[in-house]
């Protein structure tokens, strides 16, 4: 008996007739079997009595005893290949609404459909119908084109709302549910990169709805490349991929919400609990009008499906490898995709966990998902409907049922196929042998759509749509709020990182006691050279601390970002959710640094505290924005410190502590591009150490003659002992004037700059880095 329901497992239950009685046994199904509304224990025979009801999925069977027939045929209880929905006619209606909400004329109960999604309206002047999108999250499409305004409808136009297809017939509609009936066809895929290297060689596949497909092969065979090409996330540059006979590459946005993709690395934050991770994913992926109750129910359903309910409150990093992979799958199942692609989902799992994962994927396929899995493990490959074997270089060596693969290759174990593919023939020879085989005819040619069947004439490959093409999803502000909450929650959970962020400023502040002492800015006993070096050190420290704090913020979650970006994520709210947290840390760190300056050097005085605080905060923020840029361009977290070091070198050399006169025009130009130059010069002017020198340009008033000893307040100009005669006074004056002249020649440009203008430059640097971060992330969309 075949029950066509996605909640029914592939082998769900068994009925046995023994000694005049019927006995039912649940075969370890995913969603269980109920007898008289009570779930029976799996793998334990349960006797049935006349009148008992058996509930499996949405089907309820009632036992009625009748005379035993001599033969029982196989019974097929199924819905059509595409489930046709009952929809009202347009006749006599001025408008008809489509959406998830119960008050719509056509109710589509799917998580990716908005509450009020679209409306069909009759025009008063000619009676024709138009369709308009009602601000839905995932868009309304007509014949594959996004509806951006009122659009006239014509006979046989196909309207797509989520996974539902509505065909317009004047005065009538025909609606079909494709959510659990998505087929995938690949037609002569080739992926040419670099200098003509082809990673996929003329691969053609025909995958039917609800099939579980494994893609296996030797290392370097192009398994992940094939998966990416089939999913459309990194398209092949020759050939086509069809979803229900519609070109995926040129209609990517049409099927975007129906594609689930789980990369090799987990796409979840390890610091969150299972429920929190799925809840944040649901907030970002589900329509903006999804209520908290609906969101909670969707998360709960996914937890139940993946058998994660018992560990929903556990932190993900404390789960086993298999459980972590299930959470990653759960993030994709929230959108209830019809196609699910998994890259090495069983990699690194122990045999028991690997077997459980394969059974889980088998059950998901039985529930209506078409699943493609890249894997090295072949132990449980018999659970798959079809298996793809790739030879080295992207050659298709076999596609068909796993049970037939052993005979096809003439081996006794699946692992032996790897040796055959690498030893007996060239990859091209294996591909040619398969094209001449019965399996190729039966499982490729005959299963392809009729127009691509035996004749196999393909049209010119169409233009490829960019998977990052824009669609209006959740508003930028809403995404910013969700991401900010998630970042705060991650920090709260990751106590070690949060503690380090809070301690880095006071720990570095302790170093101030090593190079700072009270009175270095005073005319009596001060030291102008030391003051300059101290102020420069503080500028460098602020920039470095900012960079260290943020240099891994983006790259550490690159896989999560990449997946969320494909689905819903906007770049600006994502970056700003990082920036404002960095701003809070900058405000805190600047305050801590000023506290330690006060303790170590009794500086700055009260009237300079605010200006110094603003300068330090801006410098920290400029460093943090630079760190975010480093994080955005780094290929992996290990590269980030090296890039920060590369940027720090010119900040130190050309930032101002070495006099400008030692540099040529190139060095001076580099100096203008550094953050430390503008921070350092601001600090020098704010300190007032050279104010009297800047005011006395001609050295005729405060800073010349005897006035330099008694009126000028330049640090360290006054002798330790009062001159006792005219000769000592002249010597003291000469020393003071020489000191001032030397300092003025080397750093005089910093004695009286426009602090507000320098703050403006620091803000400009921050804005520039923000732009570079956004540009870097946009550039990654094209890869």
Q: What do the PLM-derived regions correspond to, one by one?
A:
Residues 270-287:
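Q-loop/switch helix immediately C-terminal to the Walker
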Residues 231:
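Helix-to-loop junction immediately C-terminal to a conserved catalytic motif
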Residues 332-333:
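ABC ATPase C-loop
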Residues 1-58, 88-163:
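Forkhead-associated
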Residues 340-343:
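Catalytic Walker B motif of ABC-type/P-loop ATPase nucleotide-binding domains
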